[in-house]
Each structure stands twice: as structure tokens, then as C-alpha cells.
């Protein structure tokens, strides 16, 4: 399945549900309390983040999609903090504030990136807390997807009113369910329970076949358009009536914190579907997004550039022949992992042992090696008639197959100054008997603090000599 980045800027999404504030007290612990056998935390930083349905809306906005949010809060400091955070992120938030009830707050006490304690401040909302008062049609105006973010806190009581109103307008409804009664989501386009939530409804699943069978029965019973079961380290399973089950493996490189991963899944699904992606593609994108967010601390969102880089990796463009756009993203990703970038360039018309040795030496100067290749017209201008022997596509394909080479890109000019100005490598490498100040582009690289290195060439290895031997039938 080939993935591409959706046009999220044209994908308005409405989120309705339980909003809350995730508050973090970060501090250090160096002693045990004399009052009880518990650690003493000296609080050094207090951090507020949108949680629950607010985190879903935040994730949608972080991808670049227009996001609106409807929910219930108290009339207090926590509600103001939520409103300010969401406003700053570009989320249009409509809160029904109830004076006599507190905004739901999840307070986590953290030390050295470890959660020591969670304290919940919440009271169940009244049955009529989220009174839409006939505003449903107005709220759905211009929306391409509706998300019901249900945390079972009482704000979301009118599931069917919302589902039926959206269906009447042809708007897909995605629900992140809670509780032991999934009938309240009847008719939804897609629900996204995790495995424990799913098994609480259908019973334990002995294996994948059992999960698929029970999932199909649940879809039929509730008239669901689709069912996505998130399964932690086992990935996700998408079920659709009349289609085979689609199992996706987990994509996380490192799991640091699973807080809010479900929010990231449904937000990426919603934004992708709103942008016109088919459901299997949207699920694959959501799976990539989940793999990113579990590597972050606490409730977090992923950005469009992060998702774009994950798509690149999934499509195998982490190495090989790249466009300039792909290369710049790959470089950003490498630098985020503290990897240094090495750059070299040449015609590489007939690849020989000297080239291979030189490229291995160049790669040893850093973590990632870019090889920039003169295109065919450029080689012809430099080398004369009859050159190149091999087209630029063939030359780049051979270079990309070498273990020392990470990325290959072509350029049309005689020299790579324009490319160097965009790439800004940490090290510029050239082979030959030049002095450093004679290397083309050395001034560009040196100006921003990069290094320039000249490597010796392997003796008796020359493309020109090989071409002459061939022409002379030697």
C-alpha cells in the first residue's frame, strides 16, 4: 500500500466529547519523607496540556487540519488554561461552562520522566450537561468528519442525535468508545476500541480468527460501517463488512509512554478521511502516527512533518534515490537523531573500485552520506561528446545499491553550490589532490561552520582511462 501525505488543510473536523486538562508536576526526588515511606518531590515545573477530546482536537490541528471542539468544563482556572492552549494551537473551542462543577483535571507527578502518582479531579456531569439545544445542524455546517471522543465522563450523552444528524448530511462519524454499552454508537461509520474495551463487550478473544468473528458480529449487530481494534504492541485490526480483515503491525521504534495514543489514532483517522483518503490508507497513516506518539512523554500530538517523515520511512525512501524535498526531510529526521551529514559529488559515469573505496572513506567521516550526481547534460558539458556512457538514472541506481551510500540526488549545474546551500552538510568531502580552498563549495560549507575534507584517490582507477581502453579495444 503506497502512502502519501493528505491535504489536511482542506479537511475540517468537529470533535464532540469529554474534555479535560492533563497537568504535569515535574520535579526531582532525592529523599524519602520522614512522615511516611514515600518519596519527596521538589516541584520544578508545572505544565498543562489539553487532554481527552481536547487532545483529539489538538492532534487534528497539529496535522494542519481545521479543528473545532465542543465540550463541557467548569468555570475555573483549568478551563481557562484549556481554552488558552487550544486557542494557541488554532483549535476553535466551544465550551459549555458549568459554574458548580470543576473542569476534569488529571494531575501527574513526574520525576526523571517517570510517573510517580496520578491524582484525578472530577465529578460526573449531569445528564443534560452538554445541551446542544438544536444547534447540531449549525455545528455540522462545513464539517467533513465528526468525531465522538467518549471518555465516559458524562459530557457526551446525545450520541444518537449527533450520529443521525451527521449521517443525514453524509458526514462520516468516528467514535472512540467507552463503557459496556456500545449500542449508543449504533450506526457510526467507524468505532475504535482498544482490545480490552472490545473484549469487555464481546468476551475474550483466543486468537485473531476469534477477534475477526466477534468483530463481524458486533458490526452487524450495531450497523457499523467499520471497526478498528487497536491492540498495543500487536498493532491494529480493521474490519469492514464484505472485506477481508486488515492486520497492521505496530510501527513504534521505542515505546516511552502510551498516554493519549488512542487520541492520536482517531485524530489521524478523522483528518485523513476528511482529506479524502480511503479507510485502509487512513488506518495505515493512523498506525504510523501511533508509532510516533508512543515515543513521546505524556499526552502529546504529532506534527505534519513528523508524519511525513514516517511515511517516507514506510515507503522505503529512508535510503536511495530521492528528490530534493525527500532529501531535506530525510536530513531533518537524521539530525533529530543527532546524525551528522556528509556530502560528496561527481559524475560517477562508470563505477569502479576506486569510487567504491572513496565512498566508503567518505561515509566514515560521518553518519549519513549524500552522493550528488551530475545529470546527463551536465556530464556532457564537462566531459565532452560521447559522455556520459551511462544515463543519470542508471548511475544513481548503481550508487544507491552501495552500502556506504545513504542518499543519491542529481543536479543539473556543473557544480553543486545550489544543492550545498540547501542541504548544508556537516562535512563536504572531495577526492583528489586539491587543497581545501580549491574544493568547489568549500566557502559555502565553511561559512556556517561545516568541515571540508580532501581524500586521496585510489591509484590506477579512472573512468576516463577505462573509457579509453574500451574505445581502443584494449
From Swiss-Prot:
Annotated EC: 2.7.1.167, 2.7.7.70
Keywords (A to Z) from UniProt: ATP-binding, Carbohydrate metabolism, Kinase, Multifunctional enzyme, Nucleotide-binding, Nucleotidyltransferase, Transferase
UniProt GO BP: ADP-L-glycero-beta-D-manno-heptose biosynthetic process
Region: Ribokinase, residue numbers: 1-317
Catalysed transformations (reactions): D-glycero-beta-D-manno-heptose 7-phosphate + ATP = D-glycero-beta-D-manno-heptose 1,7-bisphosphate + ADP + H(+); D-glycero-beta-D-manno-heptose 1-phosphate + ATP + H(+) = ADP-D-glycero-beta-D-manno-heptose + diphosphate
Keyword Transferase: yes
Residues that bind ATP: 194-197
Record's keyword annotation contains Membrane: no
GO CC term (a single one): cytosol
Source superkingdom: Bacteria
Active site per UniProt: 263
Pathway: Nucleotide-sugar biosynthesis; ADP-L-glycero-beta-D-manno-heptose biosynthesis; ADP-L-glycero-beta-D-manno-heptose from D-glycero-beta-D-manno-heptose 7-phosphate: step 1/4; Nucleotide-sugar biosynthesis; ADP-L-glycero-beta-D-manno-heptose biosynthesis; ADP-L-glycero-beta-D-manno-heptose from D-glycero-beta-D-manno-heptose 7-phosphate: step 3/4
Segments of this protein annotated with the region Cytidylyltransferase: 343-474
Example of a GO MF term: heptose-1-phosphate adenylyltransferase activity
PANTHER family: BIFUNCTIONAL PROTEIN HLDE (PTHR46969:SF1)
HAMAP family: HldE
Function: Catalyzes the ADP transfer from ATP to D-glycero-beta-D-manno-heptose 1-phosphate, yielding ADP-D-glycero-beta-D-manno-heptose.
Subunit note: Homodimer.
Family to which this protein belongs: In the N-terminal section; belongs to the carbohydrate kinase PfkB family. In the C-terminal section; belongs to the cytidylyltransferase family.
Protein name: Bifunctional protein HldE
UniProt lineage: Bacteria, Pseudomonadati, Pseudomonadota, Gammaproteobacteria, Pseudomonadales
Gene from which the chain derives: hldE
